[in-house]
């Protein structure tokens, strides 16, 4: 973790800005690690940080004939929960909705899979990558 300047320690907004910058840097690192990891496994990367409205898909890839929607979660070792545990039902719905938009916009006729790439980074920037294939499935909507 970066050293926090003395002035920022006494300035709540400055501290918040530094923490967000660290968080964003960690997220970018995680997405690059995930991309490299998937390419090494033979995936074809189609999109990175694809957005539709205010929803974003971290990585869209092809694994054979299957379209893979990948949510990348990167955390420092100090977090109490594993990164993949932070992909809740709301986030899953957003990803499903965005994936449907991507498939429709690109007129694709493919099976879609939702994966999570969870990355834990230690203080020396060493990392562990867990790839959870079929991490969740689209839910049927309830009609009344």
Predicted regions located by residue number:
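N-terminal basic, low-structured, amphipathic or hydrophobic segments
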Residues: 4-5
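Short acidic/glycine-enriched loop/turn segments that link adjacent beta-strands
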Residues: 52-55, 125
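Conserved catalytic cores of phosphodiester-cleaving nucleases, focusing on short active-site segments
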Residues: 38, 57-79, 83, 87, ...
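Domain-level recognition of nuclease-like catalytic cores that cleave nucleotide substrates
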Residues: 105-144
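A cross-taxon signal for low-complexity, glycine/charged-rich
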Residues: 9-13
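Mid-chain, well-packed structural core segment of small domains
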Residues: 80-112
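Protein kinase-like catalytic core scaffold
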Residues: 55, 66-68, 115, 130
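Acidic-basic catalytic patches of nuclease active cores, encompassing PD-(D/E)XK
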Residues: 16-48
